[in-house]
Design a protein with these regions (language model features):
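Short boundary segments that mark the start of a structured unit
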Residues: 87-212
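C-terminal subregion of chymotrypsin/trypsin-like serine protease catalytic domains
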Residues: 2-14, 18-90
């Protein structure tokens, strides 16, 4: 099928197919087990005695014609749309809360504000940094949900938020802390020769007294 023609294996009905399931037009197109785009349409052209297929085996749901839409073409729209769904995000750097009450049910978001100072040489350049949470006295999976990734600050933006979810519990315990490390800046730098920035957040216990 198409994957065999271009030398790319993925997930799908056959060993060289990019679709999750047969006839999955509009679904995810996968390469190396990762979503690489959207399968806009697929088809198997045939007529009379001609059934064009790369190997003549029934190992795919499509033949040699396919069209994929790259997800990355809409990455800015995806990122910015998701950010609008953040619950109660801070409207300014001064409004960022450095402490968060853990509560007893569900999760509560806490935010980190990443600010771009100065100016872009090219206004169309995307600035990015990598980020990763790190345990302090708070433990990932127990007190907060670990997160890592790449944060992009798009043209006409001067900041972006990283959201981390705090896990509720009803255990009396001391206040706890965890960290967010920001590193590997692209199209910008931290200044003064710095290679990493770190911020801390405190999870405030609301479950009674703790003696330790």
């Amino acid at each position: 099928a198409l994957g065999a023609l271009v030398g790319i294996n993925g997930l799908g009905l056959g060993s060289s197919e990019g679709l999750i399931s047969k006839g999955d037009s509009g679904g995810p197109a996968c390469i190396d087990s990762l979503v690489a785009g959207i399968a806009s349409y697929t088809s198997r052209p045939s007529g009379l005695d001609a059934v064009p297929d790369i190997n003549g085996l029934s190992d795919s749901s499509f033949g040699e014609i396919a069209a994929w839409q790259r997800v990355s073409a809409y990455q800015q729209w995806i990122d910015q749309s998701l950010r609008t769904l953040y619950p109660n995000p801070p409207a300014s750097q001064a409004a960022v809360q450095k402490t968060v009450v853990e509560t007893n049910v569900g999760t509560t978001p806490v935010y980190f504000w990443v600010q771009l100072n100065g100016y872009r040489i090219d206004p169309n350049i995307i600035v990015s940094v990598d980020y990763k949470t790190r345990n302090g006295t708070a433990l990932s999976g127990q007190d907060y949900i670990a997160t890592q990734g790449t944060l992009k600050i798009y043209p006409n933006e001067d900041h972006a938020l990283v959201a981390v979810e705090i896990i509720a519990d009803n255990l009396p315990e001391a206040d706890e802390t965890f960290y967010l490390d920001v590193f590997n800046p692209i199209n910008a730098n931290f200044g003064n020769g710095l290679v990493q920035l770190t911020a801390v957040r405190t999870i405030v216990n609301d479950d009674g007294w703790f003696w330790g």
